[in-house]
Amino acid sequence: MLKKTAIAAVLLGATALGACTTIDPYTGETVRNNTGTGAIAGAVGGALLGYLTNTSDGEQGRKNALLGAGIGALGGAAVGSYMDRQQAELSRQLAGTGVSVTRDGDNLVLNMPSDVTFAVDQADIQPRFDRVLGGVATILNRYPQTLVDITGHADSSGDDAHNQALSERRASSVAERLTGQGRVLPGRLFVMGRGETQPIASNETADGRAINRRVEIVLRPFRG
């Protein structure tokens, strides 16, 4: 059975689709614009708390935390435009950093490869990555109706238990950077470690293993 562990970062005491493609002026890449999407559908004081085995409960808890903090959910046609603006800002902020920004429906995916993020077998954020996360945090704070899913991944070099723990520590390091210095509301975050179970390249080569050692951040609109 694939190992899956989810860690929730929560607040203490606070409680149809159309698309077109355009050229991103900052990256020169073709991107899909989803402004029409959705038109039909009308503290942590320095630590992450606990383990969740029921991710649906964790999702509802996160929504409750945002509502308790006075952050309202997005609705209908506002979602596509909101995510379009956020995508443009992130693409500009992350240009030339090695971090990619891709669109998946109404979600944004930030893929952060190992040459940007962590040294081999380490979960301490490298200085270059720290600066990248600082820029991401600044934009996230301008878009408070965005949920943040952080997933750590490892290659297959170690045993399963080691890789699972390493992926969790890496994801937690990113979350702590965003909520600490970055001051992103902790209740917006959900943190996961996937170990070696979701490779995106072959683990048979050094280059492939380097690609698989990564952190992914998925940004999702907070819907009602």
Where do the protein language model's features map onto the residues?
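Amphipathic, membrane-active segments
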Residues: 83-115
